[in-house]
Regions:
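PRY/SPRY (B30.2) beta-sandwich protein-interaction domains
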Residues: 1-224
């Protein structure tokens, strides 16, 4: 059962990012629980991005891989970042030059249609942490609080926006996946996180330790 959470829910002085139901690749997900839970369609590859974009600073989020309906394997979960708003042709996170996706099946990361050896595999029940450092252009990825490595990112889009979004999705047309995002409000879906990690910024509650110098993706976090 979930633990108790102090008052970190959205409030007039601090709103936490959710996933954006109006901005999806391939129009292929069902959103619920205030857009903190997404379920992708089994017939389409797709990803979905956060409601808030990041152009400077250091931000952390966690997402739980809740379930998948693949007949075999680990479910083809994908998680990472995208440099611009989703476009329908960009169906897979990492297919383009301006998005990066961590793949559950083999632990690789996908960028510019290339897979690179990276970390461990993951599947249902695992919590993946993303730490995006836009001061140093890096993305660190965690599995259940353990670092899987760091990816160097670049602003490569034509007339680059310099803004990035956290992104959740799947890589495959044979299964559907369910993600639950926690951008700092202290819940995965309807369940409060079971044990709060440390967070030096004091902004947001996460299952595992928020890396030093990072903060939640929220209105307060964007103005630190």
């Amino acid at each position: 059962s979930g633990g108790s959470v102090i008052a970190t829910q959205d409030n007039p002085s601090n709103n936490f990012s959710r996933m954006n139901a109006l901005n999806t690749s391939n129009n292929s997900a069902v959103f619920s629980l205030g857009n903190s839970r997404i379920v992708t369609y089994s017939s389409l590859e797709a990803y979905n991005v956060s409601t808030f974009a990041m152009s400077k600073g250091k931000y952390y989020m966690e997402a739980k891989a809740v379930e998948h309906d693949a007949a075999s394997g680990l479910g083809n979960f994908h998680i990472g970042i995208a440099e611009r708003e989703c476009k329908k042709e960009d169906q897979v996170l990492g297919k383009s030059d301006y998005s990066w996706g961590y793949n559950s099946e083999d632990g690789t990361y996908f960028n510019s249609s290339n897979y690179t050896s990276f970390g461990n595999t993951y599947t249902t029940g695992d919590i993946i942490g993303l730490a995006l450092d836009l001061d140093n252009n890096t993305l660190a990825i965690y599995k259940n609080g353990v670092s899987q490595g760091t990816i160097t990112i670049t602003d490569v889009e034509d007339n680059g926006t310099g803004s990035y979004y956290f992104a959740l999705g799947e890589n495959g047309t044979a299964n559907s996946v369910t993600w639950e995002a926690n951008c700092g409000n202290g819940y995965f879906g309807e369940t409060a996180i079971s044990s709060a990690g440390t967070n030096a910024s004091g902004n947001g509650i996460f299952e595992f330790d928020c890396p030093t110098g990072f903060t939640a993706l929220s209105t307060k976090g964007l103005n630190l």
